[in-house]
Structures are given as C-alpha cells and as structure tokens.
C-alpha cells in the first residue's frame, strides 16, 4: 500500500530536488580553496569536466577577480536529438554553470595573474607586490655653528 502512494511520480516529489534545476538560480558557486604564499595568492576552484575554453577569468572594477564557467552543451543537445522516440524522466545533467567573485587584496600585481585548468581544477595564481624596501638606519652627522 505504501509503495502505491510513495512510488512512481510521488517518489520524485517527496525525495527529489524541491525545484527543477531551471528554477534554481542561474548560476551556482564553485567550491574554492584560497591559500597565501610569501609571493602570491593561489586560488583553486573545482571545474569538473570543463576545459580552458569553457572557463572565463577576468579582473573587474580594479581588484575583483571574476571566474565564470559553463559546460559545452552541444554534445547533450545532439544526444537528445538522436533519441527522439525516448521519454525523459529526469534531465539534471544539463549545462552546469557557475560564477565566483573574489575581492583581491590591494597589494597584488593584477597584470601578472595566471590561470590554468588541470584535472578538473582551475588554478589562479595572483602574484603579490613586493614589500617596499625598508630604509636602512644610517647615522646623520649633527653640525653646530658655535
């Protein structure tokens, strides 16, 4: 009896996502690690399945690092076109998109930022400005007119 009520279409309503993915926000946030070394800030962002052409990294408003990514959807569209006579029950693997903004510290070299993708991880290296040289202490001779 319980299987009659909780099975079939009701199972998806009770145990599935509360909203279809299209109703959720247009972009998700990708998981990120941010470490600081003596010479740079290193950000590692999970981008599974994405290549260098699928990710966009830029600096906006002076020091806001923006990372956006979207999986190519051409392969998924071709797959759906080939399967015209099938019935889709769930389609959650669509075109995942994400966006992430990070306010960078003021003491960084924005023009030297590097980014690379390897094994589903985007690594962004933001070099630091070198610390200003501390002036050496030097004695100053004091003169007198007497």
Curated annotation (Swiss-Prot):
One Pfam family it belongs to: HSP20
GO cellular component: peroxisome
Molecular function in Gene Ontology: unfolded protein binding
Major localization listed first in the record, in broad terms: other
A biological process term (GO) from this entry: response to hydrogen peroxide
Membrane-spanning ranges: none
Matching InterPro entries: A-crystallin/Hsp20_dom, HSP20-like_chaperone, Small_HSP
Entry keyword annotation includes Membrane: no
Sequence motif Microbody targeting signal, location on chain: 144-146
Domain sHSP: 23-143
Keywords associated with the record: Peroxisome, Stress response
Subcellular location: Peroxisome
Top-level taxon in the UniProt lineage: Eukaryota
Induction: By heat shock.
UniProt record similarity statement: Belongs to the small heat shock protein (HSP20) family.
Quaternary structure and partners: May form oligomeric structures.
UniProt name for this protein: 16.0 kDa heat shock protein, peroxisomal
Organism, as annotated: Oryza sativa subsp. japonica (Rice)
Gene name of this polypeptide: HSP16.0
């Amino acid at each position: 009896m319980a299987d009659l009520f909780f099975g079939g279409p009701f199972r998806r309503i009770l145990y599935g996502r509360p909203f279809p993915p299209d109703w959720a926000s247009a972009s998700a946030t990708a998981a990120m690690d941010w470490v600081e070394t003596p010479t740079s800030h290193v950000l590692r962002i999970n981008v599974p399945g994405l290549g260098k052409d699928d990710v966009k990294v830029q600096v906006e408003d002076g020091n806001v690092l923006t990372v956006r990514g979207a999986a190519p959807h051409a392969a998924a569209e071709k797959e759906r076109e080939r399967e015209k006579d099938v019935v889709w029950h769930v389609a959650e693997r669509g075109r995942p998109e994400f966006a992430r903004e990070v306010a960078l510290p003021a003491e960084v070299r924005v023009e030297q930022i590097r980014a690379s993708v390897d094994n589903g991880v985007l690594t962004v290296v933001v070099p630091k400005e070198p610390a200003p040289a501390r002036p050496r202490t030097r004695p100053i001779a004091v003169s007198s007119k007497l």
